[in-house]
Amino acid sequence: MTVHPSLQNYADAWTHSIEAIAELVQPLVEGEWNRATPCPGWSVRDIVSHVIGMETEMLGDPRPIHSLPRDLYHVRSDFARYMEVQVDVRRHHTAPEMTSELEYILIRRARQLRNESRSPEHVIRAPLGAEQTLEQGYRLRAFDTWVHEQDLRVTLGTPGNLDSPGALVVRDLLLEALPKVVAKDAGAPASSAVVVDVTGPVEFLRTVRVDAEGRGSVDGAPSLGPAVTLATDWETYVRLACGRVRPAEVADRVKVEGDQDLAEAILDHFAVTPN
Protein backbone atom coordinates (compact mmCIF):
# COMPACT_ATOMS: atom_id res chain seq x y z
CA MET A 1 0.00 0.00 0.00
CA THR A 2 1.45 3.35 -1.07
CA VAL A 3 -0.97 5.50 0.90
CA HIS A 4 0.46 8.66 2.52
CA PRO A 5 1.50 8.12 6.18
CA SER A 6 -1.06 10.63 7.48
CA LEU A 7 -3.82 8.64 5.76
CA GLN A 8 -2.61 5.23 6.91
CA ASN A 9 -4.39 5.15 10.30
CA TYR A 10 -7.68 6.08 8.68
CA ALA A 11 -7.21 3.52 5.91
CA ASP A 12 -6.41 0.81 8.47
CA ALA A 13 -9.39 1.75 10.66
CA TRP A 14 -11.75 1.77 7.68
CA THR A 15 -10.47 -1.60 6.46
CA HIS A 16 -10.90 -3.17 9.91
CA SER A 17 -14.49 -1.94 10.25
CA ILE A 18 -15.76 -2.63 6.75
CA GLU A 19 -14.34 -6.16 6.83
CA ALA A 20 -16.11 -6.65 10.16
CA ILE A 21 -19.37 -5.44 8.60
CA ALA A 22 -18.97 -7.85 5.69
CA GLU A 23 -18.38 -10.71 8.14
CA LEU A 24 -21.40 -9.72 10.27
CA VAL A 25 -23.91 -9.61 7.41
CA GLN A 26 -22.65 -12.51 5.27
CA PRO A 27 -24.66 -15.22 7.13
CA LEU A 28 -27.87 -13.21 7.57
CA VAL A 29 -31.09 -14.64 6.17
CA GLU A 30 -33.48 -12.44 4.21
CA GLY A 31 -35.68 -11.38 7.13
CA GLU A 32 -32.74 -10.29 9.27
CA TRP A 33 -31.86 -7.59 6.76
CA ASN A 34 -35.09 -5.79 7.69
CA ARG A 35 -34.35 -5.56 11.42
CA ALA A 36 -34.41 -2.02 12.83
CA THR A 37 -31.10 -0.64 14.09
CA PRO A 38 -30.24 2.13 16.58
CA CYS A 39 -29.64 4.43 13.60
CA PRO A 40 -32.95 6.32 13.31
CA GLY A 41 -35.11 5.04 10.47
CA TRP A 42 -32.58 2.56 9.12
CA SER A 43 -32.64 -1.22 8.96
CA VAL A 44 -29.67 -3.55 8.63
CA ARG A 45 -30.12 -3.39 4.85
CA ASP A 46 -30.26 0.41 4.96
CA ILE A 47 -26.99 0.68 6.87
CA VAL A 48 -25.18 -1.65 4.48
CA SER A 49 -26.71 0.26 1.54
CA HIS A 50 -25.41 3.51 3.00
CA VAL A 51 -21.92 2.09 3.47
CA ILE A 52 -21.90 0.76 -0.10
CA GLY A 53 -23.17 4.06 -1.45
CA MET A 54 -20.59 6.17 0.36
CA GLU A 55 -17.77 3.92 -0.84
CA THR A 56 -18.96 4.21 -4.45
CA GLU A 57 -18.73 7.98 -4.02
CA MET A 58 -15.18 7.66 -2.69
CA LEU A 59 -14.46 5.73 -5.87
CA GLY A 60 -15.89 8.58 -7.95
CA ASP A 61 -18.88 6.63 -9.28
CA PRO A 62 -21.88 8.71 -10.39
CA ARG A 63 -24.72 8.98 -7.89
CA PRO A 64 -27.95 7.15 -8.73
CA ILE A 65 -30.80 9.20 -10.19
CA HIS A 66 -33.63 8.42 -7.81
CA SER A 67 -36.68 10.17 -6.35
CA LEU A 68 -37.32 9.61 -2.66
CA PRO A 69 -40.78 8.75 -1.33
CA ARG A 70 -42.39 11.54 0.69
CA ASP A 71 -43.23 9.46 3.77
CA LEU A 72 -39.72 8.94 5.20
CA TYR A 73 -40.21 10.41 8.68
CA HIS A 74 -36.50 10.37 9.55
CA VAL A 75 -35.47 12.46 6.53
CA ARG A 76 -35.66 16.05 7.77
CA SER A 77 -32.77 17.90 6.11
CA ASP A 78 -30.98 18.29 2.79
CA PHE A 79 -28.09 16.27 4.19
CA ALA A 80 -30.42 13.44 5.19
CA ARG A 81 -32.08 13.50 1.77
CA TYR A 82 -28.68 13.29 0.12
CA MET A 83 -27.74 10.27 2.23
CA GLU A 84 -31.10 8.58 1.78
CA VAL A 85 -30.84 8.29 -2.01
CA GLN A 86 -28.10 5.62 -1.86
CA VAL A 87 -30.19 3.81 0.78
CA ASP A 88 -33.64 3.96 -0.78
CA VAL A 89 -32.43 2.87 -4.20
CA ARG A 90 -31.38 -0.47 -2.61
CA ARG A 91 -34.41 -1.00 -0.31
CA HIS A 92 -35.73 -3.93 -2.36
CA HIS A 93 -32.40 -5.64 -2.99
CA THR A 94 -32.12 -9.24 -1.83
CA ALA A 95 -29.60 -10.54 0.69
CA PRO A 96 -27.38 -12.08 -2.03
CA GLU A 97 -27.48 -8.82 -4.00
CA MET A 98 -26.43 -6.87 -0.91
CA THR A 99 -23.54 -9.13 0.08
CA SER A 100 -22.31 -9.37 -3.52
CA GLU A 101 -22.28 -5.60 -3.97
CA LEU A 102 -20.55 -5.09 -0.61
CA GLU A 103 -17.89 -7.65 -1.54
CA TYR A 104 -17.35 -5.99 -4.93
CA ILE A 105 -17.02 -2.55 -3.33
CA LEU A 106 -14.50 -3.95 -0.84
CA ILE A 107 -12.39 -5.30 -3.69
CA ARG A 108 -12.53 -2.01 -5.61
CA ARG A 109 -11.74 0.17 -2.59
CA ALA A 110 -8.89 -2.12 -1.51
CA ARG A 111 -7.42 -1.74 -5.00
CA GLN A 112 -7.84 2.04 -4.76
CA LEU A 113 -6.00 2.06 -1.43
CA ARG A 114 -3.17 -0.07 -2.80
CA ASN A 115 -2.69 2.40 -5.64
CA GLU A 116 -3.35 5.58 -3.62
CA SER A 117 -0.70 8.18 -4.45
CA ARG A 118 -2.69 11.39 -3.93
CA SER A 119 -1.62 13.79 -1.19
CA PRO A 120 -3.75 14.27 1.95
CA GLU A 121 -4.54 17.83 0.76
CA HIS A 122 -5.91 16.63 -2.58
CA VAL A 123 -9.49 17.90 -2.95
CA ILE A 124 -12.28 15.39 -3.56
CA ARG A 125 -16.05 15.69 -3.66
CA ALA A 126 -18.11 15.73 -0.49
CA PRO A 127 -21.87 15.40 0.11
CA LEU A 128 -24.23 18.04 -1.31
CA GLY A 129 -21.74 19.17 -3.94
CA ALA A 130 -19.22 20.37 -1.38
CA GLU A 131 -15.50 19.63 -1.37
CA GLN A 132 -13.20 18.08 1.21
CA THR A 133 -9.58 17.08 1.40
CA LEU A 134 -8.66 13.47 0.85
CA GLU A 135 -7.60 13.28 4.51
CA GLN A 136 -11.01 14.52 5.65
CA GLY A 137 -12.69 12.00 3.39
CA TYR A 138 -10.63 9.11 4.72
CA ARG A 139 -11.18 10.22 8.30
CA LEU A 140 -14.95 10.52 7.92
CA ARG A 141 -15.22 7.15 6.19
CA ALA A 142 -13.29 5.52 9.07
CA PHE A 143 -15.59 7.28 11.57
CA ASP A 144 -18.81 6.46 9.75
CA THR A 145 -17.95 2.82 9.10
CA TRP A 146 -17.04 2.10 12.74
CA VAL A 147 -20.22 3.75 14.05
CA HIS A 148 -22.35 1.72 11.65
CA GLU A 149 -20.45 -1.45 12.53
CA GLN A 150 -21.53 -0.81 16.12
CA ASP A 151 -25.14 -0.21 15.00
CA LEU A 152 -25.11 -3.64 13.39
CA ARG A 153 -23.47 -5.28 16.40
CA VAL A 154 -26.14 -3.90 18.75
CA THR A 155 -28.91 -5.08 16.43
CA LEU A 156 -27.47 -8.54 15.85
CA GLY A 157 -26.36 -9.12 19.45
CA THR A 158 -22.70 -9.52 18.53
CA PRO A 159 -20.76 -6.97 20.62
CA GLY A 160 -17.11 -6.33 19.84
CA ASN A 161 -14.45 -4.03 18.42
CA LEU A 162 -15.25 -1.25 20.91
CA ASP A 163 -11.49 -0.62 21.10
CA SER A 164 -10.59 -1.27 17.45
CA PRO A 165 -8.65 1.27 15.34
CA GLY A 166 -11.91 2.87 14.24
CA ALA A 167 -12.90 3.51 17.86
CA LEU A 168 -9.89 5.79 18.31
CA VAL A 169 -10.76 7.76 15.18
CA VAL A 170 -14.30 8.16 16.53
CA ARG A 171 -13.01 9.25 19.94
CA ASP A 172 -10.84 12.00 18.47
CA LEU A 173 -13.52 13.32 16.15
CA LEU A 174 -16.19 13.39 18.87
CA LEU A 175 -13.81 15.16 21.27
CA GLU A 176 -13.27 17.90 18.70
CA ALA A 177 -17.02 18.59 18.84
CA LEU A 178 -17.15 18.95 22.65
CA PRO A 179 -16.16 22.64 22.93
CA LYS A 180 -19.07 23.70 20.69
CA VAL A 181 -21.48 21.44 22.58
CA VAL A 182 -20.49 22.87 25.96
CA ALA A 183 -19.71 26.52 25.21
CA LYS A 184 -22.08 27.40 22.38
CA ASP A 185 -24.95 24.90 22.32
CA ALA A 186 -25.34 24.37 26.07
CA GLY A 187 -24.30 27.93 26.95
CA ALA A 188 -21.79 27.13 29.69
CA PRO A 189 -20.82 30.37 31.46
CA ALA A 190 -17.57 32.19 30.72
CA SER A 191 -14.52 31.09 32.72
CA SER A 192 -16.08 27.74 33.61
CA ALA A 193 -14.99 24.15 33.03
CA VAL A 194 -16.78 20.88 32.31
CA VAL A 195 -15.11 17.51 32.85
CA VAL A 196 -16.00 14.41 30.81
CA ASP A 197 -14.76 11.14 32.32
CA VAL A 198 -15.15 8.04 30.16
CA THR A 199 -14.29 4.49 31.20
CA GLY A 200 -14.32 1.14 29.43
CA PRO A 201 -12.53 -0.21 26.34
CA VAL A 202 -11.59 3.36 25.38
CA GLU A 203 -10.78 5.49 28.44
CA PHE A 204 -10.18 9.22 28.66
CA LEU A 205 -10.69 12.25 30.86
CA ARG A 206 -11.07 15.61 29.13
CA THR A 207 -11.81 19.11 30.37
CA VAL A 208 -13.72 21.61 28.26
CA ARG A 209 -12.69 25.11 29.33
CA VAL A 210 -14.79 28.15 28.45
CA ASP A 211 -12.71 31.33 28.35
CA ALA A 212 -13.75 34.87 29.31
CA GLU A 213 -15.11 35.45 25.78
CA GLY A 214 -17.22 32.29 25.90
CA ARG A 215 -15.01 30.25 23.57
CA GLY A 216 -14.50 26.58 24.35
CA SER A 217 -11.37 24.44 24.15
CA VAL A 218 -10.59 20.91 25.26
CA ASP A 219 -7.52 19.44 26.97
CA GLY A 220 -6.47 16.47 29.06
CA ALA A 221 -5.69 18.30 32.30
CA PRO A 222 -8.19 17.86 35.15
CA SER A 223 -10.08 20.87 36.51
CA LEU A 224 -10.02 21.61 40.24
CA GLY A 225 -13.50 23.12 40.34
CA PRO A 226 -15.58 22.12 37.31
CA ALA A 227 -19.11 23.41 36.92
CA VAL A 228 -20.15 19.93 35.78
CA THR A 229 -18.58 16.48 35.71
CA LEU A 230 -20.13 13.86 33.43
CA ALA A 231 -18.98 10.26 33.92
CA THR A 232 -20.08 7.39 31.71
CA ASP A 233 -18.82 4.34 29.82
CA TRP A 234 -17.42 4.44 26.30
CA GLU A 235 -20.34 2.68 24.62
CA THR A 236 -22.88 5.03 26.21
CA TYR A 237 -20.75 8.06 25.28
CA VAL A 238 -20.71 6.96 21.64
CA ARG A 239 -24.43 6.22 21.53
CA LEU A 240 -25.25 9.63 23.02
CA ALA A 241 -22.81 11.56 20.83
CA CYS A 242 -24.02 9.79 17.68
CA GLY A 243 -27.70 10.30 18.46
CA ARG A 244 -28.49 6.61 18.97
CA VAL A 245 -30.13 7.15 22.38
CA ARG A 246 -31.71 10.06 24.22
CA PRO A 247 -30.20 11.12 27.55
CA ALA A 248 -33.29 9.96 29.48
CA GLU A 249 -32.87 6.43 28.10
CA VAL A 250 -29.39 6.06 29.62
CA ALA A 251 -29.75 8.23 32.72
CA ASP A 252 -28.69 5.28 34.88
CA ARG A 253 -25.40 5.05 32.95
CA VAL A 254 -24.41 8.71 33.17
CA LYS A 255 -23.25 10.10 36.53
CA VAL A 256 -23.70 13.85 36.88
CA GLU A 257 -22.00 16.07 39.46
CA GLY A 258 -22.37 19.84 39.76
CA ASP A 259 -24.79 22.18 38.03
CA GLN A 260 -27.75 19.97 37.07
CA ASP A 261 -29.30 22.48 34.66
CA LEU A 262 -26.04 22.92 32.75
CA ALA A 263 -25.50 19.15 32.70
CA GLU A 264 -28.98 18.67 31.26
CA ALA A 265 -28.32 21.31 28.59
CA ILE A 266 -25.04 19.62 27.64
CA LEU A 267 -26.68 16.20 27.36
CA ASP A 268 -29.57 17.65 25.35
CA HIS A 269 -27.03 18.88 22.77
CA PHE A 270 -24.64 15.94 23.05
CA ALA A 271 -25.54 14.34 19.71
CA VAL A 272 -23.20 15.83 17.10
CA THR A 273 -23.60 13.58 14.06
CA PRO A 274 -25.65 15.13 11.23
CA ASN A 275 -29.24 14.05 10.68
Task: Please name every model-derived segment.
Residues A167-D211:
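A glycine-rich beta-turn/hairpin centered on an aromatic-Pro dipeptide
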Residues P222-N275:
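C-terminal interaction segments
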Residues M1-N9, M58-N115:
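Short, helix-capping/interhelical loops that line the mouth of catalytic, cofactor-
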Residues N34-R76, P127-A183:
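Short, contiguous alpha-helical
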Residues I18, A22, Q26, E55-L59, ...:
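Structural signal for well-ordered, non-membrane alpha-helices
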Residues E203-T229:
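Acidic/His-leaning functional-site neighborhoods
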